Amino acid sequence: MTSGATRYRLSCSLRGHELDVRGLVCCAYPPGAFVSVSRDRTTRLWAPDSPNRSFTEMHCMSGHSNFVSCVCIIPSSDIYPHGLIATGGNDHNICIFSLDSPMPLYILKGHKNTVCSLSSGKFGTLLSGSWDTTAKVWLNDKCMMTLQGHTAAVWAVKILPEQGLMLTGSADKTVKLWKAGRCERTFSGHEDCVRGLAILSETEFLSCANDASIRRWQITGECLEVYYGHTNYIYSISVFPNCRDFVTTAEDRSLRIWKHGECAQTIRLPAQSIWCCCVLDNGDIVVGASDGIIRVFTESEDRTASAEEIKAFEKELSHATIDSKTGDLGDINAEQLPGREHLNEPGTREGQTRLIRDGEKVEAYQWSVSEGRWIKIGDVVGSSGANQQTSGKVLYEGKEFDYVFSIDVNEGGPSYKLPYNTSDDPWLTAYNFLQKNDLNPMFLDQVAKFIIDNTKGQMLGLGNPSFSDPFTGGGRYVPGSSGSSNTLPTADPFTGAGRYVPGSASMGTTMAGVDPFTGNSAYRSAASKTMNIYFPKKEAVTFDQANPTQILGKLKELNGTAPEEKKLTEDDLILLEKILSLICNSSSEKPTVQQLQILWKAINCPEDIVFPALDILRLSIKHPSVNENFCNEKEGAQFSSHLINLLNPKGKPANQLLALRTFCNCFVGQAGQKLMMSQRESLMSHAIELKSGSNKNIHIALATLALNYSVCFHKDHNIEGKAQCLSLISTILEVVQDLEATFRLLVALGTLISDDSNAVQLAKSLGVDSQIKKYSSVSEPAKVSECCRFILNLL
């Protein structure tokens, strides 16, 4: 940083919290205000006090029974024009406050451990992360869905509202991208716990971690850049209003300001853990630390603290202690450090650290370019006579080293970090250092000798230590801080001349008027353009088409190829023929117990030959007595489990298709509907695995399954169920191309959100409106665009 550049200086110090300040967030009202949360169990609202260049505590809120860990602002609404404050705590709860209420308006319960991160989206959506390894999506006072996939605490969450995307960062070292409740992508690269996330744009975000690194990512998965500078855990990251530059805070007692991809300024604080930060609209930086004090830093001369306040801050900083094990000072041997006279030499760059010996003490100083002086940043503890065994490892670029030397190559130029472990070869380390930094190889011997000289005591038979820089020869050495899925053919593999067709893609029950599921062209009447006859759908859509002769013919043909111990007997085949005839002829006669037992036996045939039996089941399950027999509380779990196993993506497409159609037909009976609702999590999660294929009939069956679930959820107003179904619909819409499947998904969506403002808000927050807009211009079939426009009117 050049002397002409503006730099941040203290604006004010705010005292009020009694313990660590763990979270900060800017708020729109009052203008320029922010909210803080603390281990003292309180939440405080601070508003600017312009005449005094400070802030006034406007409001103190309580509601948690344990430490408060995180905070975010829920944007304004008609009911709450100034927005709401959401806080998460160690009591596993999320408290929601208005800006003028000392107690919560309501409390969100559901997490099983500390809530450590919060982020808000559009329409009142809230995303929370917890030590229980999950993230949860909330709408108003209800949990809409739970995001499961991380294997350790979810330390960071962010919402990208424009695309309906969500990000979670975890102690499992990964970041995950979620769409409509499903994990779309996992970002790997960090070598330790991910602690913070920040959004740069609709396509890029930042992450920081315990590995002391910051990474810039594209949402498509690429890591664009890695930034190093901190020497210990990075706890928080916040972006400037320009959405390019950012600030970070860490366990190394520092706030670091990053501009144009480089660390432009380092500000030391008189506290060990700098837990949190936020950037105000005017560019000022607010920082919370383990000493319970909130500090504001500014570039503005008008908002800079008085000379007395800055002097008091520097005095407080000078009295701080720096643990050589956890600071960024590398290996320290007090006996070999220069004395106070070393401070007469000016530094070469902003934030440069220098250690000096003052009697028995070791003091750390930081160079200020703008002031042209060394500022004391603390006394180093654990350094007198220290060697590397007692002073610990140094963290650099996410790895631990015995030493990390800072080397200035040219006067006033950048410094380079040279990491080294005592088990390394000095010459190989020197060679790698020169190669990495594109430096002249003629310095190889000098660098290697520098390493050897400055690691005395760790290598036998080596010379005395020296603090000379191998490039300048001066006293420049500063001990420094450092799946594919199965692709199915587009055409149904079971169709063709004279071949048995297991069901049809476009069969459904009727609605009032002409059924849009039949594809009847009369559906394009003028009335349909003004009246919504598409949704809400009131009854389940089923797959009814049957050709008993072909089904039985294929059953007998495949049975003849089965192993003897797996074959159906002639009597078995006769019983199956009777039940099929009974079903197809709409007989008032009920299937016998024996017939139902044989049907169960038939659907348990080997997977290579079972699909004709599944087709009989698909037709039979609509019969009340068959539905009750297979779907009752006693038998239902085993029945559904068997069919779910057939949905294996590596299984036979015919079995997948007919199992899905059977599930769709189960909804016509009371027992079947109850079973489908009780098994929805397992069924939906397995069914969605089939979305990646290109078999249009499977896509239509998936869409129909979603539609039938939406019919049930519309009846009982189950908001969590609606959230699951919205996730299913959104996920299928991402890949489906067949317009009949698309139409059924649109009807399902319309049914879910009809007469339910919460469901409308959730759909909007998931970005479903932007997902379906393209269908509003479909010309054929017209039912697709007409249905889409009705939905967009609701959204």
From Swiss-Prot:
UniProt KW keywords: Acetylation, Cytoplasm, Developmental protein, Disease variant, Intellectual disability, Neurogenesis, Nucleus, Phosphoprotein, Repeat, Synapse, WD repeat
In-chain residues carrying the UniProt-annotated modification Phosphoserine: 50
GO biological process: cellular response to lipopolysaccharide; inflammatory response; macroautophagy; negative regulation of protein K63-linked ubiquitination; nervous system development; phospholipid metabolic process; positive regulation of dendrite extension; positive regulation of neuron migration
ARM repeat windows: 546-588, 589-620, 621-669, 670-715, 716-755, 756-795
A GO term for molecular function: phospholipase A2 activator activity
The UniProt record lists the keyword Aminoacyl-tRNA synthetase: no
Major location category of this protein: nucleus
WD repeats (start-end): 17-56, 63-107, 110-148, 149-188, 190-227, 229-268, 270-307
Domain PUL: 533-794
Residues that bear N6-acetyllysine: 529
Induction (free text): Up-regulated by tumor necrosis factor alpha (TNF-alpha) (at protein level).
Subcellular location: Nucleus; Cytoplasm; Synapse
Entry-linked InterPro entries: ARM-like (IPR011989), ARM-type_fold (IPR016024), PFU (IPR015155), PFU_sf (IPR038122), PUL_dom (IPR013535), WD40/YVTN_repeat-like_dom_sf (IPR015943), WD40_repeat_dom_sf (IPR036322), WD40_rpt (IPR001680)
Chain segments annotated as coiled-coil in the UniProt record: none
Keyword hit for Hydrolase: no
A single Gene Ontology CC term: nucleus
Domain PFU: 366-465
Entry's disease: Neurodevelopmental disorder with progressive microcephaly, spasticity, and brain anomalies: An autosomal recessive neurodevelopmental disorder characterized by progressive microcephaly, spastic quadriparesis, global developmental delay, profound intellectual disability and severely impaired or absent motor function. More variable features include seizures and optic atrophy.
Subunit organization: Interacts with ubiquitin. Interacts with UBXN6, VCP and YOD1; may form a complex involved in macroautophagy.
Annotated PANTHER family: PHOSPHOLIPASE A-2-ACTIVATING PROTEIN
Description of its domains: The PUL domain is composed of 6 armadillo-like repeats and mediates the interaction with VCP C-terminus.
Family membership noted in the UniProt record: Belongs to the WD repeat PLAP family.
Function: Plays a role in protein ubiquitination, sorting and degradation through its association with VCP. Involved in ubiquitin-mediated membrane proteins trafficking to late endosomes in an ESCRT-dependent manner, and hence plays a role in synaptic vesicle recycling. May play a role in macroautophagy, regulating for instance the clearance of damaged lysosomes. Plays a role in cerebellar Purkinje cell development.
Protein's name according to its UniProt entry: Phospholipase A-2-activating protein
Source organism of this protein record: Homo sapiens (Human)
